[in-house]
Amino acid sequence: MNTIEPTLLSRLRALPRPAWILFLGTFLNKFGTFVLPFLTLYLTQRGFTLNDAGLAISAYGVGSLMASALGGHLADTIGRRKTIALSMFSVAAAMMLLSQSRSLPAIVAATWLAGLTGELYRPASSALLADLVPPELRVTAYAAYRMAFNAGFAFGPATAGFLATRGYFWLFAGDAGTSALFGLIALAALPRGLHTRREEGGWSDDVKEMAGDGKFLRVLCGAFFIALVFLQISSTFSLHVTRLGFPAAAYGLILSLNGVLVVFCELPLTSLTRRFPPRLMMAAGYLLIGAGFSLNALARSAPALVACVVIFTLGEMVTMPVSSAYIADLAPAHLRGRYMGAYSLTWSAALIFAPQMGMRLFGVAPAALWLACGALAALAAIIIVPFSRGGGGYGPSDTCTRSAGRSHWAKAARTSGAVNPK
């Protein structure tokens, strides 16, 4: 039976081969993220203090923050493929350097370098996916990209635990090896994507152009506030679970539900979310995330905690693929990498502030934190939601501008000073 609305399977089949290669490389890279989850354990077993380990992890965060801006610039100037390969080969070297570091200053420097080089590829990957996929398929493409990302994280730690029993060196070697493999795949099989001619690039001009895009600034502002909420999952949420009397293992099991839901449910959910204006879906997702976290103020049992996770994960699945696709629609083709880098930068910045905010409020009163999460999510939704009739013209809809979007995508590739992505 023929239908106007394409099925999920048909949309996946319509994705170009390079997109699937990018998904494969992303899965391999995230599967091989062996060192960071075990870094605290590795350092403390070598005689370093928890404060030392925290300093090293903070150095990684600072490096990743810098990578968001630099990676977007490189993606638009030297090209997506070269940026991905540069990132993967550099982080492989950084991991081997970290494995041989013995003093705390050397370890901190190596982890900073790993954060910088390891996160350079993200804006380039997101921008390359937008280059390859026309607007009507972008929500599906970014959902598939996130599925590969989360599936790698889901299966990687078990392998890392096995390698750690054979010696921590194998964690570093495995991490470096999978990164280098993704780098080789990028050079051999990925297209270079769009990139700006060198004479067109300029940090000040780029910043001025992005700062003049009010729609994009609203997206960044809303994303920062919702990131402050969502990132409680890796800090205060664990304290909340153990405060209720559950063991740390229970936190791990409850949290694993988030990854399982994303891997198996996010792609099918795009069949629904892609039918609506993107800003409405982003706002709805923000409200669901806020509801899931704010309900922790009432959660006292394991089923209640599971319900909270399901609700905020549903919000994550609704908003994340739509957000990436929407930013790709907003971005001029010659600034696509920098737009993606700026979006990544908001999350990196929130990663610095979210634990501080969460810990302070949790120390005052846990309920105050969870209610604040609901308020911040509501604020993010208000910032992003369209008030004017017809959506205010905030970029192309995933369903309403298919033919127009396709011609816009092709025109952008021809007229923006960019090269053909193939």
Residue map of PLM features:
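Cytoplasmic helix-loop-helix junction between adjacent transmembrane helices
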Residues: 110-149
